[in-house]
Regions:
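Hydrophobic/aromatic beta-strand elements that line small-molecule binding cavities or substrate pockets
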Residues: 88, 151-159, 184-192
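Beta-strand/loop substructures that line and gate deep hydrophobic ligand-binding cavities in soluble
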Residues: 2-45, 166-227
Length: 242
């Protein structure tokens, strides 16, 4: 991130801060003495038990504020964007298998996939595949409240991050609000390297978004994509045997 490495200890510190924040935001009790990993695992179970409707009901006022703030930021930003970019290296999988596993988790609306998508980052309140879209409810960076938006895959209107042909697998899509307002987008690109894979993940925000949000979202990307990649490594048989 910004040509600087971010180690496991720093990621753990970030996760602990943010997982506790989500517990509080959802009005859930937690064990202060539990490890960060335990807190994250229990939070995932609690989110699953609550279900989509109950979670949205708890944070509906925050989502309305998020919607308003994104509309204002988008209108005042025009076509200008800021980018949160994080590069990740991993061993134990190749791009071909990773792509198929990620497609499986992203496009198939199953109970297992919903749980996986909640588990990879404590800031995920909901990630729900809906035909050609992925509904996302998450806290982006250190924003004051969670946001709701929809990623329309394989559409690139307004995406400013160019495709790099050296990365054979990509996830690209526009991010829009419920009313269709385009607020940004994603272009995540992946390739095989000598020892595993290299992932360059990028999210585009309206330019008016504070730098602090964009910078913190780089860590969010590191956490969630490390989680997805590790899950893919552990579940390669999903596609190898199909």
């Amino acid at each position: 991130m910004n040509e600087k490495s971010f180690d496991a200890k720093a990621l753990e510190k970030w996760k602990r801060k943010h997982v506790i924040s989500v517990y509080k935001n959802l009005g859930l009790s937690y064990d202060w003495e539990a490890s960060t990993e335990q807190l994250c695992e229990v939070l995932t179970e609690k989110k699953v038990d609550l279900g989509y409707d109950a979670i949205v009901a708890k944070i509906q006022n925050q989502l309305k504020l998020g919607d308003i703030s994104l509309k204002i930021a988008t209108k005042l930003s025009g076509k200008r964007r800021k980018k949160a970019t994080t590069k990740i290296y991993a061993e134990g999988i190749d791009v071909e298998i990773l792509g198929r596993v990620i497609d499986h988790v992203t496009y198939l609306n199953t109970a297992e996939n919903l749980k996986v998508n909640l588990s990879v980052c404590p800031e995920h309140y909901a990630l729900v595949p809906r035909e050609e879209e992925l509904e996302v409810i998450e806290k982006t960076g250190n924003a004051p409240f969670p946001m709701q938006f929809f990623i329309r895959f394989n559409e690139e209107e307004g995406i400013q991050t160019p495709r790099d042909e050296e990365y054979p697998y990509q996830i690209v899509g526009i991010a829009k609000l419920k009313d269709g307002t385009i607020i940004g987008g994603v272009r995540h690109q992946f390739r095989n390297v000598e020892q595993g894979i290299e992932a360059v993940t990028c999210v585009e925000f309206p330019a008016l978004c504070p730098n602090s949000i964009v910078k913190d979202h780089q860590i969010h990307l590191a956490v969630e994509w490390s989680g997805w990649i590790q899950w893919a490594i552990d579940h390669q048989d999903l596609v190898q045997n199909s």
